[in-house]
């Protein structure tokens, strides 16, 4: 069970703080069922309600600093997505995002970064699907790493680059 004040990752909402654990007084909602009341830290004014009894499938703790540093050092060995069919690739991106796994977000970022370079060299634009999933994966990854490493989100990318180049 998560505790009030704890940082968690919740689905596509990114890093959230557990604001409360309570029942809801809303019509049509089981008044006996407990919910985590989450506040996404990068979506001001948003609130997410997650039933406590289903949180195992949709929430997890934010990486520790040690786990974040290990993940960053493992980035060069994380494989690319090797699907060439654009429709299947979008399904794979979607599946990777749903896993709520930082390594899967890195796979998306690495794959799209290389696809983007190839398209630019060929005089073509980045696809809308690639742009969308690149942004989503970066937002989720950098948001979580910023919390884990206790640094501003806008410094995460340069930190990763420095650590990999060591």
Residues covered by each model-derived region:
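Charge/polar-rich, low-complexity and marginally structured segments
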Residues: 53-166
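A positional/architectural concept
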Residues: 1-57
């Amino acid at each position: 069970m998560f505790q009030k004040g704890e940082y968690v990752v919740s689905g596509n909402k990114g890093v959230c703080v557990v604001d409360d654990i309570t029942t809801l007084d809303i019509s049509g909602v089981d008044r006996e069922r407990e919910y985590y009341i989450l506040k996404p830290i990068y979506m001001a004014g948003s609130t997410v309600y997650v039933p406590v009894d289903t949180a195992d499938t949709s929430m997890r703790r934010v990486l520790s600093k040690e786990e974040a540093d290990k993940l960053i050092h493992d980035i060069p060995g994380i494989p690319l997505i090797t699907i060439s069919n654009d429709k299947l690739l979008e399904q794979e991106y979607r599946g990777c995002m749903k896993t709520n796994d930082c390594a899967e977000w890195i796979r998306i970022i690495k794959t799209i970064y290389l696809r983007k370079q190839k398209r630019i060299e060929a005089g073509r634009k980045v696809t809308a699907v690639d742009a969308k999933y690149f942004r989503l994966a970066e937002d989720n990854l950098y948001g979580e790493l910023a919390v884990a490493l206790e640094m501003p989100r806008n410094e995460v990318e340069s930190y990763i680059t420095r650590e990999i180049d060591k």
